[in-house]
Amino acid sequence: MNAWQRGLLLALMGLPAVLAAQPPALPAVKVTHRAPMYLDTARSQLGFEVRSRLGQRIEGNFPQFEGRIEVLSDGRHQVHLKMFTRTVEIPGKVRYTGWMRGPDFFDAERHPVVEFDSLPYDPARVDQGGDIQGRLMLRGVSHPEVLRVDKAECARPGYDCDVVSRGTVLRGRYGMDNWQFALSDRVTFVLRARLTGVPEP
């Protein structure tokens, strides 16, 4: 037996010990991709409230809006909302509607979309109520804001009952600082959300 053959034999004899020392293979990881959930715009409502300096509450709504909820790989959710200002209205008040769409308020001609993108959050917050942090883009200006979600009134919020959330912003921070003598600086957005389809198990 020459030196090369002896070396090969020794290597083969030591192979079982090397294999035994190897850590066991990790089990395959099952990656689940869940489709986004979408707002049912026919059954959802998205509006806003602002008060006059005399205490009168002015209520408006966004007839056109859209929203989706992304399900992240770690189970958290992330919501994306769009509100279209060119159709915003104060029901029954043509003059107020024109003013809300005009340059002193939403400035719909230059800024036709208001957007809110949340940070990832635990979906249990929708059941229990709580704050959802995010960022609002309004009139080309972006600031961190908070949506406050009411505690759910049913076992399947978004399907059997509305998910109700509110977010109050200071309009002066977004360049909507005219009419301060007549209107409060606070504008509250109100979302009553229903989802399309059926809940996944």
Segments (PLM) and residue ranges:
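Residues at the start of alpha-helices and the adjacent loop-to-helix junctions
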Residues: 8-9, 13, 59
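Bacterial N-terminal signal peptides that target proteins for export
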Residues: 1-8
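Low-complexity, acidic/polar, glycine-enriched regions of mature
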Residues: 21-201
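Hydrophobic h-region of N-terminal signal peptides that target proteins for export
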Residues: 12-21
